[in-house]
């Protein structure tokens, strides 16, 4: 059975859009830090007959019949997640990282309680207390930031804020912070003020799993993450704990607290991704992600473009475009015109609005999946610099796009295997 052929016949409009998106991914350099390319096996699992099955509850404790096989799948996903992150408890049902965070808040907090996370403009996340998010509307959100000189965490300042505000929950883990997170120092501060400590490792989960970034599990009361990004799985969420008894309270906060039936086809895809991440070659992949990010950062620095914090320890490279008198909005448009996908982003102490910004956020996870190495990323950095430093030069624009397409052809997405896998 050719699944896409069936789709083409039954809904040619959607089929054409899917093919257009496939072509876009093949012919563009994906540098959005929160994106990656899932394996064919992961996509096959999430496109399986498991999408037909309703399974409210936990394995062996369902509210529906016919769950014997999805029980096996979900239990396997749980065991693999625990092994991957050295945790004693896991819930694989959250539909997203935001849903995982919401379940934690429901378990640990009451409306009006004080939570403390990084300011969104400094690299935090909407779900860590932004006023436009439920976390900032239901709770008293206070924020910490980075040091103005170094753009890195300053634990003396964080401790002072915690001592003054006495939060019930401290959140560490970010969406645009390129440096290593010291979870032990956060634990010490949380203990001093009597707060719960939650780590949101959505961006660095793959690096943590590969033991290339410190693991928050020993230090935090609860850990949340997405399953895509550096973990390279399907879009979804995950909650982890070192204390199995403590973790059980989050089960009820996921269901029935914040969700209904779990997406068992996505849970199967998570299980596949966890198995992939447990293989030795995934460590090699994660090592390459970091190597590539360092090369990308140094290439841009050598061309006179400032990088927030002066470099990176993970997959994120955050450009501070004030060094070339450009906004993130303009830079995003310029690189998109040569088939490079990135996103405008605020930088610490940004004078521009979130709709304009002074930064451009890049990530190396997706292109590393395509096989890009340090030499290839040096070329990517040169292309970006050439485009940003010559915004009105149409000849250079054309040359940059040509160089991008050459790289795309050199490192094909799925190497032509995608069509064969669906027949």
From Swiss-Prot:
Residues annotated with N6-(pyridoxal phosphate)lysine modification: 229
RNA-binding as a keyword? no
Q: Which UniProt keywords apply?
A: Amino-acid biosynthesis, Cytoplasm, One-carbon metabolism, Pyridoxal phosphate, Transferase
Any one Gene Ontology biological process term? glycine biosynthetic process from serine
Q: Which cofactor does it need?
A: pyridoxal 5'-phosphate
The EC number on file is: 2.1.2.1
Q: Which Gene3D superfamilies match?
A: Aspartate Aminotransferase, domain 1, Type I PLP-dependent aspartate aminotransferase-like (Major domain)
A Pfam family hit = SHMT
Q: Give the main location.
A: cytoplasm
Spell out the HAMAP family in the cross-references: SHMT
**Localization:** Cytoplasm
Organism superkingdom: Bacteria
Tell me how this protein assembles.
Homodimer.
Q: Which reaction does it catalyse?
A: (6R)-5,10-methylene-5,6,7,8-tetrahydrofolate + glycine + H2O = (6S)-5,6,7,8-tetrahydrofolate + L-serine
Site (Plays an important role in substrate specificity) found at 228
In which residues is (6S)-5,6,7,8-tetrahydrofolate bound? 120, 124-126, 353-355
Q: What is the lineage of its organism?
A: Bacteria, Bacillati, Cyanobacteriota, Cyanophyceae, Synechococcales
Q: Which organism is it from?
A: Prochlorococcus marinus (strain AS9601)
Q: Which GO terms describe its molecular function?
A: glycine hydroxymethyltransferase activity; pyridoxal phosphate binding
Task: Return the InterPro entries for the record.
Answer: PyrdxlP-dep_Trfase, PyrdxlP-dep_Trfase_major, PyrdxlP-dep_Trfase_small, Ser_HO-MeTrfase, Ser_HO-MeTrfase-like, Ser_HO-MeTrfase_PLP_BS, SHMT-like_dom
Can you name a GO cellular component term? cytosol
What metabolic or biological pathway is this protein involved in? One-carbon metabolism; tetrahydrofolate interconversion; Amino-acid biosynthesis; glycine biosynthesis; glycine from L-serine: step 1/1
Q: Which family does it belong to?
A: Belongs to the SHMT family.
Role, per record: Catalyzes the reversible interconversion of serine and glycine with tetrahydrofolate (THF) serving as the one-carbon carrier. This reaction serves as the major source of one-carbon groups required for the biosynthesis of purines, thymidylate, methionine, and other important biomolecules. Also exhibits THF-independent aldolase activity toward beta-hydroxyamino acids, producing glycine and aldehydes, via a retro-aldol mechanism.
- What is the name of the protein in this document? Serine hydroxymethyltransferase
């Amino acid at each position: 059975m050719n699944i896409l052929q069936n789709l083409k016949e039954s809904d040619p409009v959607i089929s054409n859009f899917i093919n257009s998106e496939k072509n876009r991914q093949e012919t563009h350099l994906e540098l959005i830090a929160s994106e990656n390319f899932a394996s064919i096996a992961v996509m096959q699992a999430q496109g399986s007959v498991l999408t037909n099955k309703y399974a409210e509850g936990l394995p062996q404790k369902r509210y529906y019949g016919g769950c014997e096989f999805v029980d096996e799948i979900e239990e396997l996903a749980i065991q693999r997640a625990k092994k991957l992150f050295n945790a004693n408890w896991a819930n694989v049902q959250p539909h997203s990282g935001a849903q995982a965070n919401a379940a934690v808040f429901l378990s640990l907090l009451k409306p009006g309680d004080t939570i403390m996370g990084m300011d969104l403009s400094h690299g935090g996340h909407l779900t860590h207390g932004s006023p436009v998010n439920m976390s900032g509307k239901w709770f008293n959100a206070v924020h910490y930031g980075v040091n103005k000189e170094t753009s890195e965490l300053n634990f003396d300042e964080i401790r002072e804020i915690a001592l003054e505000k006495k939060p019930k929950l401290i959140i560490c883990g970010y969406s645009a912070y390129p440096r290593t997170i010291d979870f032990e120092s956060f634990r010490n501060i949380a203990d001093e003020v009597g707060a719960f400590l939650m780590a949101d490792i959505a961006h660095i989960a793959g690096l943590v799993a590969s033991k290339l970034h410190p693991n928050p599990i020993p230090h935090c009361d609860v850990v949340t993450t997405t399953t895509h990004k550096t973990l390279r799985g399907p879009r979804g969420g995950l909650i982890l704990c070192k204390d199995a008894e403590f973790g059980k309270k989050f089960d009820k906060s996921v269901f029935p607290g914040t969700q209904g039936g779990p997406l068992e086809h996505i849970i199967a895809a998570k299980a596949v991704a966890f198995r992939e991440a447990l293989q030795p070659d995934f460590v090699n992949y994660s090592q390459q992600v970091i190597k590539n990010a360092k090369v990308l950062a140094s290439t841009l620095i050598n061309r006179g473009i400032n990088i927030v914090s002066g470099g990176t320890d993970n997959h994120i490279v955050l450009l501070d475009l004030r060094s070339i008198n450009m906004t993130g909005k303009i830079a995003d448009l310029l690189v998109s015109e040569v088939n490079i996908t990135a996103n405008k982003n605020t930088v610490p102490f940004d004078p521009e609005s979130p709709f304009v910004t002074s930064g451009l956020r890049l990530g190396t996870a997706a292109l590393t999946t395509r096989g890009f190495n340090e030499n290839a990323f040096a070329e990517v950095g040169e292309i970006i610099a050439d485009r940003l430093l010559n915004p009105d030069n149409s000849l250079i624009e054309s040359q940059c796009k040509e160089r991008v397409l050459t790289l795309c052809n050199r490192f094909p997405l799925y190497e032509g295997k995608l069509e064969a896998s669906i027949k």
